[in-house]
Curated annotation (Swiss-Prot):
PROSITE patterns according to UniProt: AA_TRNA_LIGASE_II
Renumbered residue ranges of the record's region Catalytic: 209-502
SUPFAM superfamilies: Class II aaRS ABD-related, Class II aaRS and biotin synthetases, ThrRS/AlaRS common domain
Protein name: Threonine--tRNA ligase
Amino acid sequence: MAGPDRKPVSSAAATTPAPSAPVVLPKTSESSQLLKIRHSMSHVMAMAVQQLFPKARVTIGPWTESGFYYDFDNPDPFTEADLKAIKKGMIKIINKKVPLERVEVTRAEAETKIKAQNEPYKLEILEGLQDPITLYTLGEDWWDLCAGPHVEHTGQLNAKAFELESVAGAYWRGDETKAQLHRIYGTAWETPEQLAEHKRRKEEALRRDHRRIGKDLDLFSIEDEAGAGLVFWHPRGARMRLLIEEFWRQAHFEGGYELLYTPHVADISLWKTSGHLDFYAESMFGPMEVDEREYQLKPMNCPFHVLTYASKLRSYRELPIRWAELGTVYRYERPGVMHGLMRVRGFTQDDAHVFCLPEQISDEILKILDLTERILSTFDFNTYEINLSTRPEKSIGDDAVWDLATKGLIEALERKGWKYKIDEGGGAFYGPKIDLKIEDAIGRMWQCSTIQLDFNLPERFKLDYVAADGSKQRPIMIHRAIFGSLERFFGIMTENYAGDYPFWLAPEQVRLLPVTDEVQPYAESLLDQLTQAGVRATIDRSGDRLGKLIRTGEQMKIPVLAVIGAKEAEQNAVSLRSRRDGDLGVAAVADLLRAAESANSQRAAGLGLNG
């Protein structure tokens, strides 16, 4: 873990009370016992399903980081009533302490057993397995192709620490042209207390769901008529996006970057040169023909920055060159994987590319780490998980350059003082990289920033610079994204704040609540003053009673509600209610203006006025 100790801004309490003592919820990959429990529970579920639904054919049933699932080919979808019946069947199996045993068989024996059970999907799985073939039996009547591991018997599973959570559609092998299956998701833990904490966190995650908040606060939408995965930013959301972009640009100018704007499409020949058609074609939208030339929407900004570099002769004296762009890219995503702002087909990537000398790598990476911390901490992301991925077996590039690049990344992380894990051999074939995950207010980790060295594109595009001795040399190219996708970051940020955005970022910062018609002119005058001061303010002109005015403002999560009555109008003041700080009492208009301007300039969470 790394990053400052400053705590994330708190938001409204969860609807379900947290336990008095914290309950640790390990991931499956962090606990060998939990892995066995969840893997075994998926088998128990499959056995219970086939006992209740003899026509159901089994496919695969792996563990996940928070539970397990199993995909079934069944004539009908599973209902809520079915899940309850399946759970009862699972409890019976658990209580019987049925043994799970590993058995090695020949391929012919496995094929005979599979055909006897009429399990066509298992037959297909068998074709891809290498000898020896292992089965796990669950009692005498049920078995599955499986490498394990599992618990010794079902009595080691806690019947009070699991739940069947939901049903979803899936395709065999993830291929939409193949059979549609029915997936049952479940979760399993060692103790009932862990299950209760898991449920509480799920409930809290639902409360924070950016899709619901985006609709409630009128921030964005995805319109079916336009197409899946294409985001419409509404005025309130667009205002927030503009604030984020303005801060991003300012931070980059101060960090020594210049900005680029590049096209949304390019001739197909560019994508051939870059290698995208060889390695990324499935994620690209198909070509369009214009004036007898084929064009494709860009899935990445990198080749455009490379062409900009290649547009003129470069000298070593110019390096490092730092270019950044908020570039809209388009990637084909299958219908089943799109999710709100988190997974879309058109999004804005905050791409930057640094072209530098080999000896400049460490300094440039450190500058990127500093800029990353500055930007992420402004949105109250202060705890990071960092992975350094090194050279894989199959790679391109000179050994000395790989060593220099990897040492440069390590040196920068050490100079920054950030802890990191090394993923040996986990880098791309064209260079080592740093991946940074951010932790949100409820402990979830999100992949966010990436720093990637690239020895591939400079070679493909024959990039060079004139060295001090007059020779032509290849520059080092560093890809870098801090937000990654701006849309995805907006979704993560929204869930982190639960829609209670800090004052500087809120789409509507102050709402004026005149309690009578007589004070309306005063409210209009105050609105002008706030607007002139750069404060995003509105007046509620509905004429509702004060209680409803306040409730409406709170539902829209307005940071500051300013109540205006006759007394406030006479005193050139307002009565302030802050979502963050509660009742602030009566404040002079001059004090409100001063506090709001200061909060905006400092990108502060609240007004800083004391009640």
